[in-house]
Amino acid sequence: MKAIVIGILASLFFAVTFILNRAMELSGGSWLWSSSLRFIFMVPFLCLIVIMRGTFTPLLLEMRKKPFYWIKWSFVGFVLFYAPITFAAAYGPGWLIAGTWQITIVAGVLLSPLFYVKQDMPGGPQLIRQKIPLVSLGTSVIILIGAALIQLQHAESLSGRMLLFSVLPVVIAAFAYPLGNRRMLEEYGGRLDTFQRVLGMTLASLPFWLILAAYGWWSDGLPTASQTVQSFIVAVSSGIIATVLFFWATDMVRDNPQKLAAVEATQSGEVIFALLGEIVLLSGVFPSLLSFAGLFIIIAGMMLHTFASQPRKPKKKAQSNLTA
């Protein structure tokens, strides 16, 4: 239950990404700067935190052992996640991006067979390939249906261009994020803490963000003061607070596929927070009755996930009242 609450809190801070990315695009900011500045701003904060915790040197030692592993999965988990998200914001509204992003809930469940979990066997601990938790898949699909209902009130305004450039990139991001996170969690979940993993992945992906920033400078010039400030807010809110909270929550349940799916499902809260944020901050369209039904289904789906992930208490054997 604690991991799920932390996951919901993370979704609140993640929602800032969808709202501010859309605001930056509406004000003429380049998606290249929106994506790169977030991770560039994250570096000094995370370095300070990890150094103060005295865990910076162990992180560097681990990264030196497998540099290409870090680069590969940091690229998948961070670059293929956030660059498509900011690119999509240039072509579609925040509600569409946040709604499409909910595919990641099902994606995380479907990716389960790619990973292994350590189990105690008669001959000693062994790595067992995970299976798709069908109960979690069912409740994840329920949440996805709720997210789809929220989008229906806006469906008439969608063009083919908007679908191609705003939906497809988010689908790629929806699979890349849990894949990169789980790969790093599988390899370093027991050796590195959450702050170390986030910093390590940020440092490993930094060359790609610097390339995007250089291209943004060449093609669009320097970012505006407004975009810089908003990117800084996204870096702190989503890049540091939300990412650390979410990685912490997944780390707590890394050995239980069903609980891990439940934590990943808490990301559905983003569509709720993003919708409310756009209404309040960007004068977005007020939800219809169908959208409210979608919100209710999302909340119900998260509650089902929470219930399904709780350990079952063994039934006590009935004691016989018969006397000899």
Curated annotation (Swiss-Prot):
Keywords assigned by UniProt, alphabetized: Cell membrane, Membrane, Transmembrane, Transmembrane helix
Pfam families recorded: EmrE
Transmembrane segments: 5-24, 39-61, 68-90, 95-117, 130-152, 162-179, 199-218, 228-250
InterPro entries: EmrE
Subcellular location: Cell membrane
Gene Ontology annotations for the cellular component aspect, listed alphabetically: plasma membrane
Membrane topology summary: Multi-pass membrane protein
Keyword Transmembrane helix: yes
Protein name as catalogued: Uncharacterized protein YjlA
Lineage: Bacteria, Bacillati, Bacillota, Bacilli, Bacillales
Gene: yjlA
